[in-house]
Amino acid sequence: CAAGPALEGMNIQQGMRGETGAIEDVEIRPDGIHLKVIGGGPAEGICGSGILAGIKELLRCGVLRKSGAFVHPDRLPEGDARKEYLQVNPEDGTRSVRLQENPVLVNITQKDIRQVQLAKGAIRSGIEILLENNGLDPSMLDEVMIAGQFGSHLLPEDLTGVGILPEEVRDRIHYVGNTALTGAVAALLSEGVRREMEALAKEIGY
């Protein structure tokens, strides 16, 4: 689905894996944009957790509309600090937000926002269908489990802030690690687990 590439830094203009040089968190304060970069040095790009955090902050401070479109700098009051990082390309009019200027220019572009919207749609629609098919609403969920090594780096406030997960489950999100690896090891070591997996596979619909 669309979620993997966008949230792992692919299809993002300056996306990269979660390694040294990747922006992993973004905070917008009155004095400007503050970045958390893996390794502590200057940013070389942005990884999945960084793009989610950035979008959540842009929504919170009013630079990004709920539709996913950037506001135009001309619509902001004179002297507004947000004009310092909200940019418009003079050639085609496209808008972006500058996270870092030197030594490497790192932006969040309108296209990046669209990629994350596709990811959000893929995940959220699956959640909504599961809830509807079982007669549930988000407030009735006891727990939401986030699997995978990458998933453990996604903060609850970012997942709910951009709408990937419903706001009602923010305090019920738990991280369960690399369940694919755990399941593979269990299947190799236990015939009973393999039989259980085969039985479950026959019951699962899609």
Model-derived features: positions:
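Glycine-rich phosphate-binding loop of actin/hexokinase-like ATP-binding domains
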Residues: 1-50, 155-177
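Non-transmembrane, aqueous-exposed alpha-helical and coiled segments at domain scale
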Residues: 23-31, 127, 134-139, 181, ...
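Conserved phosphate/anionic-ligand binding catalytic regions in large, soluble enzymes, centered on
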Residues: 43-64, 147, 152
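A contiguous, well-structured pocket-lining segment that forms one wall/lid of small-molecule binding clefts
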Residues: 59-134
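Glycine-rich and small/hydrophobic secondary-structure elements
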Residues: 110-119, 164-186
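Hydrophobic alpha/beta core scaffold segments
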Residues: 124-138, 154, 162-168
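Glycine-rich phosphate-binding loops at beta-strand->alpha-helix junctions
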Residues: 138-157
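Acidic, glycine/GT-rich loop-and beta-edge segments that sit at the periphery of enzyme/chaperone cores
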Residues: 186-206
